[in-house]
């Protein structure tokens, strides 16, 4: 296009024409004979004429109101051409882009002042064309972007955007729509703000003006100002203090900012991802994409309450205080038998993926809770649960697709021999049912378990859990239960897994000689309550053939170990190349939704069909099935099993290096993201129970959640959500090493 031809209507003789980036118009930097500089903008879409005229009018108005330069028309009229296209000439503003200058708190403060003056100037400005202009960059329309989320091809990225849009829809949308509206610039990003001498000197590009609550303008300005900033809270406070010199924010507006900032970033990365699917997109579309993703990652680490509290005092509101009554009310209404983690318990208010947010504003890295297997509050699970609850929730006495669809998916992760599944509401119920089925199938009662094992909170679960009957207030094993030694390599009693298996076989033989024929042997592939102890290699390989020869059923309790947590395999028993007769499922199966399952062989399931109907009121309901199905999809789509393997190896490498430096780390246990660090007295080699408790609580004080386990409660255990990253591992070890350095045993 010959720019000089379409510029003939303007009293300017260009001597230099430089093409600029743009996505709604063709933009040029023009220098005339006298050295004056202008911005020439050419529009091909004739339907934009009235809106651009309204934009010109607004810029002219602001140029008379603001103490800084405003990009404005350099020629009183826009020129329209015979084909309907049109152009305009704007003033050129000198200065550096905000993105290119060194950040300072003083500059952020001044930016806040300028935004406040801008809002003050526009409080009563009305223009029907602007008010009618509806577009995707108006944050009131942010949920329209959900239609384009699929353009984000990486599911681990897409979930973050879906999460924040979901949070906005649930907790912010309704409040935002009740706020008064006014004309806004709506794109105060760091490319549209000019700086000179550490002061804001100009604002350009009014192409996204809209009619919306003023807090949207602040959210957009902050979304870009916070890019690449080490401490977003400090930057936000500096800008807010400047804004507060001339404008106030209501408590509602302050509460909205956290989600609105995230939403603007989400719209930006969605737009970039969509643009990437076309070959004609300008590089301008991608200019802040990586920074926006980085800030979204960082945003997850910021507690919404902390962010709100960083603003409230600036606008003369008290900080949100933790609810001090919740602990007293818990004691009043609940039994003390329900224990709390940590010497000073945490009052949690919300969560996201591997982060949990407390009422005091702290964000906790969750390295402990294995139930939210694919992450806390995963938006896909929330969405499918909500949709199914609005459609059908019944029981297994009726036919419905969700039951069979999930069963097919689940059983696809087992060998063909394991082809039937029973659904219940928890791992405890599943273990209980497994024993009931085993005793019926074998017509035997006696059971074999492992020392320090745990299999649930039912009466039967306690009977078969050495962790309980050999623990505090325990009365030892019932007469129909025989505990076998836990086959552990560290501080073990046998030299190998095979030796442990031979020892177990000897114990069973003695039972047999006494006329006691066991029905089943139940164990976890990794003993959680035993101290995160992987069964010694060779144990199951040598024991299982013997069990089969005696028609003793082998039950693998995968409640904590299964669904890809060990990384190398989907189920824990697969690590040992053995085949169980039954598999107990629970905890991660529904990512926090109560669901459990028992998988077994056809002949065992058929034998249980003896006229005494099995029925679980809620087991296998459509909501549970849809949620569980989504968990499997997320594990596959987000590559979480592989992430468990890679992140677990990274953890193991750092842990073993640290153990060389700190001998109180007696043993490092790692199978994927099933992790344990046994803490000992380095002199006596005795379990360091008190020390482990101190370490756990000090990690909590550094906002990292772990726990302790094992018969001596001296094993620091970590079983985080499978989205746990290498960066999270680094965060853990940075805190852990500082604590080890300062905490003498």
Locate the predicted segments by residue:
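Active-site acidic catalytic loop and adjacent metal/ATP-binding pocket
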Residues: 24-32, 39-40, 169-216
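A cross-family kinase active-site recognition segment
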Residues: 101-156, 179-181, 445-474
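ATP-binding glycine-rich phosphate-binding loop
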Residues: 10-28
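ATP/Mg2+ or Mg2+-diphosphate-binding catalytic cores
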Residues: 268-326
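An alpha-helical support segment within catalytic cores of ATP-dependent transferases
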Residues: 2-7, 126-127, 143-186, 325-331
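A conserved alpha-helical element in kinase catalytic cores
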Residues: 42-83, 101-102, 106-109
């Amino acid at each position: 296009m010959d720019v000089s031809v379409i510029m003939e209507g303007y009293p300017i003789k260009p001597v230099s024409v430089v093409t600029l980036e743009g996505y709604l118009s063709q933009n040029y930097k023009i220098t005339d004979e006298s050295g004056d500089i202008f911005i020439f903008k050419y529009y091909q879409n004739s339907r934009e004429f009235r809106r651009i005229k309204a934009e010109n009018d607004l810029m002219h108005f602001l140029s008379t109101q603001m103490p800084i330069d405003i990009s404005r028309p350099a020629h009183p009229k826009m020129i329209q051409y015979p084909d309907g296209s049109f152009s305009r000439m704007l003033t050129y503003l000198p200065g550096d882009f905000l993105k290119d200058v060194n950040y300072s708190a003083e500059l952020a403060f001044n930016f806040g002042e300028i935004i406040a003056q801008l809002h003050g100037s526009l409080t009563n400005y009305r223009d029907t064309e602007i008010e009618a202009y509806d577009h995707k960059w108006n944050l009131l329309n942010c949920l329209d972007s959900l239609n384009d989320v699929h353009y984000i091809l990486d599911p681990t990225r897409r979930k973050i955007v879906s999460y924040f849009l979901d949070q906005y829809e649930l907790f912010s949308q309704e409040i935002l729509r009740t706020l008064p509206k006014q004309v806004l610039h709506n794109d105060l990003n760091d490319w549209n703000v000019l700086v000179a001498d550490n002061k804001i000197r100009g604002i350009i590009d009014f192409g996204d003006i809209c009619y919306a609550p003023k807090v949207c303008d602040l959210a957009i300005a902050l979304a870009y100002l916070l890019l690449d900033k080490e401490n977003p809270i400090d930057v936000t406070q500096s800008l807010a203090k400047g804004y507060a010199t001339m404008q106030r924010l209501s408590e509602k507006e302050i509460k909205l900012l956290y989600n609105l900032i995230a939403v603007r970033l989400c719209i930006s990365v969605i737009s970039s991802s969509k643009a990437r699917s076309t070959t004609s997109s300008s590089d301008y579309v991608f200019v802040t994409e990586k920074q926006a993703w980085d800030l979204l990652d960082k945003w997850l680490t910021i507690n919404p309450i902390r962010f709100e509290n960083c603003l409230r005092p600036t606008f003369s509101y008290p900080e949100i205080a933790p609810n001090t009554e919740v602990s007293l009310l818990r004691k009043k209404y609940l039994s003390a038998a329900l224990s709390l983690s940590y010497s000073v318990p945490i009052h949690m208010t919300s969560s996201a993926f591997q982060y949990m947010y407390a009422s005091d504003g702290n964000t906790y890295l969750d390295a402990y809770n294995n139930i939210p297997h694919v992450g806390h509050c995963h938006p896909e699970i929330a969405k499918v649960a909500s949709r199914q609850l609005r459609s059908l929730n019944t029981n297994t006495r009726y036919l419905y697709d969700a039951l069979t669809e999930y069963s097919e998916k689940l059983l696809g992760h087992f060998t063909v021999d394991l082809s039937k599944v029973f659904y219940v509401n928890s791992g405890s119920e599943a273990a209980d049912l497994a024993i009931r089925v085993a005793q019926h199938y074998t017509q035997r009662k006696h059971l074999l378990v492992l020392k320090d094992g745990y299999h649930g909170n039912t009466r039967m679960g306690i009977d078969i859990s050495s962790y309980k009957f050999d623990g505090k207030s325990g009365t030892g094993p019932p007469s129909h239960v025989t505990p076998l030694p836990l086959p552990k390599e560290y501080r073990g009693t046998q030299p190998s897994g095979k030796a442990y298996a031979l020892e177990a076989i000897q114990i069973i033989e003695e039972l047999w000689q006494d006329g006691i024929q066991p029905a089943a042997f139940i164990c976890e592939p990794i003993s959680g309550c035993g101290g995160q102890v992987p069964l010694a290699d060779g144990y199951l390989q040598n024991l299982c053939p013997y069990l089969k020869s005696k028609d003793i059923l082998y039950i693998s309790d995968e409640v904590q170990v299964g669904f890809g947590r060990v990384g190398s395999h989907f189920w824990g028993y697969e690590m040992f190349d053995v085949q169980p007769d039954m598999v107990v499922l629970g905890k991660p199966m529904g990512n926090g939704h109560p669901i459990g399952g028992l998988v077994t062989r056809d002949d065992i399931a058929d034998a249980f069909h003896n006229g005494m109907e099995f029925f679980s009121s809620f087991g296998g309901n459509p909501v549970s099935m849809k949620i569980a199905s989504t968990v499997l999809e997320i594990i596959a789509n987000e590559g979480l099993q592989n992430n468990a393997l890679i992140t677990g190896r990274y953890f193991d490498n750092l842990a073993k290096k640290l153990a060389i430096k700190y001998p109180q780390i007696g043993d490092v246990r790692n199978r994927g993201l099933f992790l344990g660090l046994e803490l000992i007295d380095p002199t006596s080699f005795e379990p360091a129970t008190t020390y482990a408790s101190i370490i756990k609580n000090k990690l909590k004080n550094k906002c990292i959640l772990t726990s302790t386990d094992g018969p001596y409660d001296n094993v620091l255990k970590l079983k985080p959500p499978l989205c746990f990253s290498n960066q999270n591992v680094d965060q853990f070890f940075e805190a852990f090493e500082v604590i080890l350095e300062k905490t003498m045993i």
